[in-house]
Amino acid sequence: MSGWPRIYYKLLNLPLSILVKSKSIPADPAPELGLDTSRPIMYVLPYNSKADLLTLRAQCLAHDLPDPLEPLEIDGTLLPRYVFIHGGPRVFTYYTPKEESIKLFHDYLDLHRSNPNLDVQMVPVSVMFGRAPGREKGEVNPPLRMLNGVQKFFAVLWLGRDSFVRFSPSVSLRRMADEHGTDKTIAQKLARVARMHFARQRLAAVGPRLPARQDLFNKLLASRAIAKAVEDEARSKKISHEKAQQNAIALMEEIAANFSYEMIRLTDRILGFTWNRLYQGINVHNAERVRQLAHDGHELVYVPCHRSHMDYLLLSYVLYHQGLVPPHIAAGINLNFWPAGPIFRRLGAFFIRRTFKGNKLYSTVFREYLGELFSRGYSVEYFVEGGRSRTGRLLDPKTGTLSMTIQAMLRGGTRPITLIPIYIGYEHVMEVGTYAKELRGATKEKESLPQMLRGLSKLRNLGQGYVNFGEPMPLMTYLNQHVPDWRESIDPIEAVRPAWLTPTVNNIAADLMVRINNAGAANAMNLCCTALLASRQRSLTREQLTEQLNCYLDLMRNVPYSTDSTVPSASASELIDHALQMNKFEVEKDTIGDIIILPREQAVLMTYYRNNIAHMLVLPSLMAAIVTQHRHISRDVLMEHVNVLYPMLKAELFLRWDRDELPDVIDALANEMQRQGLITLQDDELHINPAHSRTLQLLAAGARETLQRYAITFWLLSANPSINRGTLEKESRTVAQRLSVLHGINAPEFFDKAVFSSLVLTLRDEGYISDSGDAEPAETMKVYQLLAELITSDVRLTIESATQGEG
């Protein structure tokens, strides 16, 4: 490009460089989208806009992509490197109005006909200044936002710092030419498909128009289900119909979000400023699969694990910066206090009570509101655990909202609903001290403004944050596979509860928890905490800690827990340096070197971070424990031992493998442990390697407390086969608390009620106990003896003496 156009662009770029601060989606387009910069690249934009073109240019230059203003030379032919699908008023003939775009597509395709080695990558790019969906006023949402010059000027002026450049995966023009030909009709089809692509992309980024709140309430009141619930309310409480209707409206006011794009923008600015000061980085993985689902028209339901109140803000912030619509979020009614409640409501929160029992009107209003969100196409987010995990492990899922999601599908008319499991990880959780107190029996403090201010005042260096998107679960596909005749239950009026609903919801919930754990993120803090807590003195020399971290890292890299899990690329030494900056550990120096210590008062809190990745290391830890105890053991016997204990571990930690997959996993882990020199393999037997016995012992310690807990329950069951489930849970906790005191076990979840409740349910499912409570003493004693070999003799004596003392 030369002459007047170049001067014009330079002049136009002066104000744009000041007013526009755009963000690229994805953050690093070339590697994330697989663009090959050694091959020709041309850009396709939805409509003629110089501001968009220059904003794209700035991002291309920042990411080492070809300059869109520099023409492509192919076989002596000069062609513009960009194409506008929709035309507009032109200043120079250099611009390409709509009919020109078809000609340009044809020219590019024609060059592929004459040059068999040519393969131009066509990259669709949309530039968005602001993402306000607007309010419903009857007009149809335009497929592309065409702004004239004056409108564009004000959009840039007001929204220049809220602009996004969205790069889409490239389309190979070579493949297009080979499969569809190169004539003009193919060029026209290409332009038409591009227009549809941009319309879908805009909907995925901006979302459907927002309803006026009163219009939404009126529509809900007119629904058959709520009208019937209002009549029932009036009859059962002996109040007038008007009063019952007012009660319904009051519930809608309590529940419904009041989404505000301006509040999203303001919060984005504040959070952007805050994150940069609190977090050293927010790591996002597998977002492209979610963008693709949104682009394909799926109704997205985000199902993250729940670690902290920070989850609400972090996930919405991440989604917004990934070019997706911030979802409507189901938040606990405990967060509806001033000023947080009104702010969260404008950020998309809708509030949910802890229980629906005994309030038919409330449950009907909530279910209809959720169904309305789905039918309008809004993305939704809820925490399937029901509350924040106090231990760092996933909680057993609460299935109420998930059940309502499937009931919404049974009303018919919704787009395909896809559940997106999300793992959220932190190197520092601000509530972790409060969690430890609550697990020790302290009363949960009610959320309030003073409590919020105290929490904010404690915010310091939070390290790294992690948001990993797990494997999506399309509900329609799942139901087609597991409940082939589910469509027979569709009822557009009534909320139906077919017989298959509860077991199916339970299975989906369990599957979601597994998928969340599959997307686990190892980081400096949880790895260092795992190693230091494995040491009985909670201290290791720097060399020992480095060796232990290398063991964990190699296991996770060479035998990955799943394809969705992430492991740091940094070295063990770099991870230790980073963890030390978090000020959780003490360092003592002597003439030999550094000793890294986890102070006693911190040890209880640090179990939280260890538990975040317990599922990723528990199988190699169990293998290490078995090999350490037996000194040498055949693969077959090792496999038998793992097979006996695996169902309990799978249920407790939501592990991903089925029993029939275990032999291959055990073999892969054994080979990796041999490669690391932790064990030797001789004649199909695993032997300890004395040179690395400490590393193996520390690895084995990762399963120590879990095995002790199982030993308690199996001993109680063997000693009293007729014990009922409730008493078994209670007595197991009592012995665990005693063990914790006598043997200095610092993990609060060691005697957590939920952990023992889950274990006893698994024992029932595995046939160790029946619903009537009777156990098979021979079987339970066999398992106890297996466990007794894996725990120390002093712990075993404490367990056995506890029950003898009671007798």
Swiss-Prot record:
Task: Describe activity versus pH.
Answer: Optimum pH is 8.5.
Which domain of life does the UniProt lineage start with?
A: Bacteria
* Predominant location category: membrane
Q: What is its EC number?
A: 2.3.1.15
Q: What is the effect of changing G386L?
A: Reduced acyltransferase activity
Task: For the motif HXXXXD motif, give the residue ranges.
Answer: 306-311
Q: Name one Pfam family in it.
A: Acyltransferase
The chemistry this enzyme catalyses reads: sn-glycerol 3-phosphate + an acyl-CoA = a 1-acyl-sn-glycero-3-phosphate + CoA; sn-glycerol 3-phosphate + hexadecanoyl-CoA = 1-hexadecanoyl-sn-glycero-3-phosphate + CoA
Q: Which UniProt keywords apply?
A: Acyltransferase, Cell inner membrane, Cell membrane, Lipid biosynthesis, Lipid metabolism, Membrane, Phospholipid biosynthesis, Phospholipid metabolism, Transferase
SUPFAM superfamilies of this UniProt entry? Answer: Glycerol-3-phosphate (1)-acyltransferase (SSF69593)
Keyword match Oxidoreductase: no
Q: Which GO terms describe its biological process?
A: CDP-diacylglycerol biosynthetic process; fatty acid metabolic process; phospholipid biosynthetic process
**Topology of this chain in the membrane:** Peripheral membrane protein
Domain observations: The HXXXXD motif is essential for acyltransferase activity and may constitute the binding site for the phosphate moiety of the glycerol-3-phosphate.
Q: How does it assemble?
A: Interacts with ACP, YbgC and PssA, forming altogether a complex at the inner membrane.
- Protein function: Catalyzes the transfer of an acyl group from acyl-ACP to glycerol-3-phosphate (G3P) to form lysophosphatidic acid (LPA). This enzyme can utilize either acyl-CoA or acyl-ACP as the fatty acyl donor.
Q: What is this protein called?
A: Glycerol-3-phosphate acyltransferase
Task: Tell me the organism.
Answer: Escherichia coli (strain K12)
The primary gene name is: plsB
